[in-house]
Amino acid sequence: MVKVAAFVCGVASSGKSTFCGALMSYMKSVGRSCHLVNLDPAAENFEWEPTVDIRDLISIDDVMEELDYGPNGGLIYCFEFLMENLDWLNEEIGDYDEDYLIFDMPGQIELYTHVPILPALIRHLQVTLNFRPCAVYLLESQFLVDRTKFFAGVLSAMSAMVMMEVPHINLLSKMDLLKDNNNITKAELKRFLNTDPLLLTGEINETTNPKFHELNRCIVQLIDDFNMVNFLPLESGNEESVSRVLSYIDDATQWYEDQEPKDPDRFEADDLEDDE
C-alpha cells in the first residue's frame, strides 16, 4: 500500500502549523490514518502532538548556545545533523505503513530555495522507505494587497518547485482574512490564483521607479515561460476547504489508485427476514 509524505512548506507566519493541525483533524474525522512529523527544531506549540519530532534528536537552542550560531545557521546545522543521522529517522518513521505522514517544516525560505538538504531528504524517503512525497507550499493571502510582494512569493514558490522536484501544490492561506478586503474583486482574485503575470505590469509601473520596469518585464516573461505556479485558496478553519486541498494531495501522490475497494455493506439478518 502507498505511503505518503506531505511536506508543508512556506515562509514564517504563513499558517503551516495551523494547516497541519486542520489537516490532521479532518483526516482523523473521516477515519484516515495520519501522523504529524515535526521537522522544525525551533517549534514550540502544536495543536496535535507530533508522532516524530526532530527536537528529540537535536534542538536549535542547544546548537545556538554551544556553537554560537544564529537562528538561520542553527537551522541549517540541525538539518545537516539530521542527514548524518538518518538511521534515527528511519527507525522513527519506518513502521508507518499505509499512512500519511504530514511534515511540518520550518519557515526559513532558504531551506526550500537555496540549500540542497531538503531534496536529499526527500530522495531518501522515496528510495529507502518507499514514500510518495508531495510539497504543499503556503503563501499568505495578505500578499495580494501588495502585488510586488505577491510576485516575490510566486518566485519563491517557483524556486522551491524547481529545487524539490516533487509533485507540488501551492496554497493561498488565510483566505478568510481576505474577505474583509474590498479592494480585491472576485475577477482579480481569480487572476491571482492563476498567477496572471500581467498583474505585475500596468498599474505597478505607474507607481514604481522607471529603472525597475525592465526588471518587471523580465519577471513577467520568466513566470509566463515556466507557467508552473497556480494557487488553491485555503481556509484552515473551513472543513470543506481543507478537504479540497487533501483531494489535490491525494491526486498528486496517486493515493486513490492504491486503495482497495471496500466490500458492500451486508444486510443484517433481520432486514432480510423483513423483506421476506
Curated annotation (Swiss-Prot):
Alphabetic keyword roster: Cytoplasm, GTP-binding, Hydrolase, Nucleotide-binding, Nucleus
GO MF annotation: an example: GTPase activity
Cell compartments where the protein resides: Cytoplasm; Nucleus
Coiled-coil positions: none
Pfam family of the protein (one): ATP_bind_1
Biological processes per GO annotation: protein import into nucleus
Stretch forming the signal peptide: none
Record-listed E.C. numbers: 3.6.5.-
Keyword Secreted listed: no
Enzyme class: hydrolase
Motif (Gly-Pro-Asn (GPN)-loop): 70-72
Binding-site residues for GTP, renumbered to this chain: S13, S14, G15, K16, S17, T18, S173, K174, M175, D176
UniProt site (Stabilizes the phosphate intermediate): N72
Key word Nucleus present: yes
Composition skew (Basic and acidic residues), residue ranges: 259-269
Region annotation (Disordered) ranges: 257-276
Superkingdom per UniProt: Eukaryota
GO cellular component: cytosol; nucleus
Subunit description: Heterodimers with gpn1 or gpn2. Binds to RNA polymerase II (RNAPII).
Protein family membership: Belongs to the GPN-loop GTPase family.
Function: Small GTPase required for proper nuclear import of RNA polymerase II and III (RNAPII and RNAPIII). May act at an RNAP assembly step prior to nuclear import.
Entry protein name: GPN-loop GTPase 3
Lineage: Eukaryota, Fungi, Dikarya, Ascomycota, Taphrinomycotina
